[in-house]
A protein has these predicted regions:
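Flexible "cap/lid" loop of the alpha/beta hydrolase fold
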Residues: 157-187, 229
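Catalytic active-site module of serine/aspartate enzymes centered on a nucleophile-bearing elbow/loop
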Residues: 240-273
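Conserved hydrolase catalytic core segment
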Residues: 127-166
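Conserved loop-alpha-helix segment in the C-terminal half of the alpha/beta-hydrolase fold
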Residues: 217-247
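C-terminal motif of bacterial Sec signal peptides marking the signal peptidase cleavage site
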Residues: 16-19
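Conserved HGGG/HGGXW glycine-rich cap/lid loop of the alpha/beta-hydrolase fold
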Residues: 46-100
Length: 273
């Protein structure tokens, strides 16, 4: 599958995007320290009597945290995780209600989702610094987590993380409510999307890659341009951020896992002192 060239942050205008914020930072990232080589495959208490399932393998630092797309978990990374674990410690997990993790109750916002990840990393003894690799709706969680833990973020890779719905049709809204029968995460999807988008801010002078899909044959030119252009909003994470335009479907980790592995490896190499 062909890939167009990277688009440097310096040539991108944010005039088309609203709410783009930037926060001051000294650009520092913790010096890598040896991470525990101990493999993890189990469930860990995260409060409220719930457990979340996490798997980690490999050793080294920074640790790669794989954040799956909506209502997906560890299995999304089956073609990516083994090879990335040959490079450094790599962890994936099932969010509440997904896979082997306990369900949550109530309507869940961004703070609930980032809080689960924070508590899970502590319970499983997975220290930073981290490279966050997030697919689709998992990117909003990664955005919120990065905003809360800037000093621990060494790099970011986004896999077709869209901008939030601005005016969704009523039938879609009905499917995205917390109590919808298909909403196994009990996530307030629209609120999480907007909160994750609003959380965008400069994390530091770190390597960031935003992989955006143009949807290829059959998609309207307007749809292609809109998706790619809107996702440039994620480049605010770092002055070193770049965008890669992909000619795949939305599920990049399934359709072109080697490209994902390559991009993660390049980000890891760029974190080296």
């Amino acid at each position: 599958m062909s890939v167009r060239g990277r688009i440097p942050l310096g040539v991108i205008s944010f005039a088309l995007l609203s709410g783009c914020a930037s926060a001051p930072t000294d650009g520092s990232v913790p010096s890598p320290v040896p991470a525990s080589p101990t493999a993890v495959n189990g469930s860990f208490e995260v409060g409220e009597g719930r457990t979340l399932h996490m798997e980690c393998s490999g050793d080294g630092s920074p640790t790669v945290i794989l954040e799956a797309g909506d209502e997906s978990g560890v299995e999304e990374w089956s073609q990516v995780m083994p090879e990335v674990a040959d490079l450094t410690r790599t962890c994936a997990y099932d969010r509440a209600g997904v896979g082997q993790s306990d369900p949550a109750t109530g309507c869940r916002g961004l703070d609930d989702l980032t809080g689960d990840l924070d508590r899970l990393l502590a319970a499983a003894d997975v220290p930073g610094p981290y490279v966050l690799v997030a697919a689709s709706g998992g990117g909003y969680i990664a955005s919120g987590f990065a905003a809360e833990h800037r000093e621990e973020i060494a790099g970011v890779v986004f896999l077709d993380v869209p901008g939030p719905y601005l005016d969704p049709p009523p039938d879609l809204v009905a499917r995205l409510t917390c109590d919808a029968s298909t909403n196994i995460e009990r996530r307030d999807y629209l609120a999480v999307e907007h909160a994750g988008w609003d959380a965008r801010a400069e994390v530091g002078d770190i390597p960031v890659t935003v992989m955006s899909v143009d949807y290829g044959p059959g998609a309207s030119l307007e749809a292609e341009r809109t998706n790619v252009e809107v996702q440039r909003g994620w480049l605010v994470f770092s002055p070193r951020a770049t965008q890669v335009v992909m000619h795949t479907g939305h599920g990049i980790a399934y359709e072109d896992p080697q490209r994902v592995i390559d991009e993660i490896e390049m980000v890891l190499e760029a974190t080296s002192p």
